[in-house]
C-alpha cells in the first residue's frame, strides 16, 4: 500500500525529520489559504498521486503568487495526471500539496527496501538525487552506496556516518544525515514498511538537509497492526479491479494486453505470461488464484478479468497438487455459466485428476478449449485472439 507525499511527510514530522512546511488542500480556496499560513512566497504546488514523474507531466510547479496557486489547483483538482509510471488513463488528482519553496544547493538520494537475498533492510544513498534510482543503478551503479541493517542490533549511528562520508558530507551535515538515517530506519521498522525513499534529500543554500520529497510503501501483510496507516489508504489511486481482487484474496495486477490469465501460483503465473509473450500474445493481467481455487473464487476471478474491455480471450492454467483438477473444472464450468463468458476460454489442467478434469470440460458443451500442454495452451489462446 502506497502513501501520498504529504502523508509521508506527516510521518517524517512525527519522527522529527526535517521537511518543508506544507498543507494538503482539497479546493483552490484551501490552497490559497495554505499559502497564507506558510508566509511569503515563492511556493511549490504538487499534485498528489501515487506515481513518479509528476514534474515532467506538469504536476509540480514553483509559483510566486496566490493567483498562480489558485490557477494550478483549478486546473488539476478533479483531473487525471498521466506520467510515465501510470497507464494511459493516469491517476486522479484529489489533493494539492502547497509547500514553502526550498533553495537547493545539491540533491542527494536516500532510501531503503527489504533485500530478499540478504533478508535484511538495506539502505541506499547516492549523490545522484532527483533522478530515478533505477536509472542510476543501471548506468552508474558505483554511485549507489549501501548498508544493511542487522535484524538483532538494529540501525547504528556509525552506519549513517559511513554513508554520509561516502556522499562527501562534512561538518554538521554528517550529524544531520545520521539523524535522518536513524529516523528513517525507525519509521521503516516500527511501521512495517516495504519501501521508504527521499528523492531528493537536498542540501539547502543555508547548509542544512531537508527531506524535499517522500515516498512510503507499507507491507500489506502487516497492515492489521498499523491502524493509522490503514486509514491513510487512498483507494481512488488503485485499480478498481485490483481492489476487488484483494477482497477475495486474489493477487491481481492489471497489464496492457488482451489475453486474460488465471493461474494458481505466482511462479506459474509469471511463466504463463512469459510463454504467452513468446508466442506473440500480450497478457492483460497477472492473476494468481492461489491454492484455494474454489468455484466462488474462480467465478470472481472471471468477473475481474472480463471487466477489462481489452480482454479478447482467457487462458486458465491450473496445476493440481493439493487441489484436484476435476474440482477446478467444475469451478470453471460453473463460473463460465454464471458469468456468461463471451470470449474463447483455453484451459490447461495438469496434475491431480487432470484427465478427469479435461473430460468434464470437453463434455460441458461450453466454449472451452482444452489444451494438452502449456505451449499448446499459449498457441491456442493467441490463435483465438487473432481469429484463427
Curated annotation (Swiss-Prot):
GO annotation, cellular component aspect: cytosol; succinate-CoA ligase complex
Cofactor: record remark: Binds 1 Mg(2+) ion per subunit.
The keyword Magnesium belongs to this UniProt entry's keyword annotation: yes
Superkingdom, taxonomy of origin: Bacteria
GO molecular function: ATP binding; magnesium ion binding; succinate-CoA ligase (ADP-forming) activity; succinate-CoA ligase (GDP-forming) activity
Domain ATP-grasp: from-to ranges: 9-244
Binding site for Mg(2+): 199, 213
UniProt-listed SUPFAM superfamilies: Glutathione synthetase ATP-binding domain-like, Succinyl-CoA synthetase domains
Metabolic or biological pathway: Carbohydrate metabolism; tricarboxylic acid cycle; succinate from succinyl-CoA (ligase route): step 1/1
GO biological process, one term: tricarboxylic acid cycle
The enzyme's E.C. designation: 6.2.1.5
A Pfam family of this chain: Ligase_CoA
InterPro entries on file: ATP-grasp, ATP-grasp_succ-CoA_synth-type, ATP_grasp_subdomain_1, Succ-CoA_synthase_bsu_CS, SUCC_ACL_C, Succ_CoA_ligase-like_bsu, Succinyl-CoA_synth-like
Binding site for ATP: 46, 53-55, 99, 102, 107
Record keywords, A-Z: ATP-binding, Ligase, Magnesium, Metal-binding, Nucleotide-binding, Tricarboxylic acid cycle
Residues annotated to bind substrate: 264, 321-323
Enzyme class, broadest EC rank: ligase
Cofactors, names only: Mg(2+)
The reaction(s) this protein catalyses: succinate + ATP + CoA = succinyl-CoA + ADP + phosphate; GTP + succinate + CoA = succinyl-CoA + GDP + phosphate
Function as written in the Swiss-Prot or TrEMBL entry: Succinyl-CoA synthetase functions in the citric acid cycle (TCA), coupling the hydrolysis of succinyl-CoA to the synthesis of either ATP or GTP and thus represents the only step of substrate-level phosphorylation in the TCA. The beta subunit provides nucleotide specificity of the enzyme and binds the substrate succinate, while the binding sites for coenzyme A and phosphate are found in the alpha subunit.
Self-association and partners: Heterotetramer of two alpha and two beta subunits.
Entry similarity comment: Belongs to the succinate/malate CoA ligase beta subunit family.
Entry protein name: Succinate--CoA ligase [ADP-forming] subunit beta
Lineage: Bacteria, Pseudomonadati, Pseudomonadota, Gammaproteobacteria, Enterobacterales
Name of the encoding gene: sucC
Amino acid at each position: 500500500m502506497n502513501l501520498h507525499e504529504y502523508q509521508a511527510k506527516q510521518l517524517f514530522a512525527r519522527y522529527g525529520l526535517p521537511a518543508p512546511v506544507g498543507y494538503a488542500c482539497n479546493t483552490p480556496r484551501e490552497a490559497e489559504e495554505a499559502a497564507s499560513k506558510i508566509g511569503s512566497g515563492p511556493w511549490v504546488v504538487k499534485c498528489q498521486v501515487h506515481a513518479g514523474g509528476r514534474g515532467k507531466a506538469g504536476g509540480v510547479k514553483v509559483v510566486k503568487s496566490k493567483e498562480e496557486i489558485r490557477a494550478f489547483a483549478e486546473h488539476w483538482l478533479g483531473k487525471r495526471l498521466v506520467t510515465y509510471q501510470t497507464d494511459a488513463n493516469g491517476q486522479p488528482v484529489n489533493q494539492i500539496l502547497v509547500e514553502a519553496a526550498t533553495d537547493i544547493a545539491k540533491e542527494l538520494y536516500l532510501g531503503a527496501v527489504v533485500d530478499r537475498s540478504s533478508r535484511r533492510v538495506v539502505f541506499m544513498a547516492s549523490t545522484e538525487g532527483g533522478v530515478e534510482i533505477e536509472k542510476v543503478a543501471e548506468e552508474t551503479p558505483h554511485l549507489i552506496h549501501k548498508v544493511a541493517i542487522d535484524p538483532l542490533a538494529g540501525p547504528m549511528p556509525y552506519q549513517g556516518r559511513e554513508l554520509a562520508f561516502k556522499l562527501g558530507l562534512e561538518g554538521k551535515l554528517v550529524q544531520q544525515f545520521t539523524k535522518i538515517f536513524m529516523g528513517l530506519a525507525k519509521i521503516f521498522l516500527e511501521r512495517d514498511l516495504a519501501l521508504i525513499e527521499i528523492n531528493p534529500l537536498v542540501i539547502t543554500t543555508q547548509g542544512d538537509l531537508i527531506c524535499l520529497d517522500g515516498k512510503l510503501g507499507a507491507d500489506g501483510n502487516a497492515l492489521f497492526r498499523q491502524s493509522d496507516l490503514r486509514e491513510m489508504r487512498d483507494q481512488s489511486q488503485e485499480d478498481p479491479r485490483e481492489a476487488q481482487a484483494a477482497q477475495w484474496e486474489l493477487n491481481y495486477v492489471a497489464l496492457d494486453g488482451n489475453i486474460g490469465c488465471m493461474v494458481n501460483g505466482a511462479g506459474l503465473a509469471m511463466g504463463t505470461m512469459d510463454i504467452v509473450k513468446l508466442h506473440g500474445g500480450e497478457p492483460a493481467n497477472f492473476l494468481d488464484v492461489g491454492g484455494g481455487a474454489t468455484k466462488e473464487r474462480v467465478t470472481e476471478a472471471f468477473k475481474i478479468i472480463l471487466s477489462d474491455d481489452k480482454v479478447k480471450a482467457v487462458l486458465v492454467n491450473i496445476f493440481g497438487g493439493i487441489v484436484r483438477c476435476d474440482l477446478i473444472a467444475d469451478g470453471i464450468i460453473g463460473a463460465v455459466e454464471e458469468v456468461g463468458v463471451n470470449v474463447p476460454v483455453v484451459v490447461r489442467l495438469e496434475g491431480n485428476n487432470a484427465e478427469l478434469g479435461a473430460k468434464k470440460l470437453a463434455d460441458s458443451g461450453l466454449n472451452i478449449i482444452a489444451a494438452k500442454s502449456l505451449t499448446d495452451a499459449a498457441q491456442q489462446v493467441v490463435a483465438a485472439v487473432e481469429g484463427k
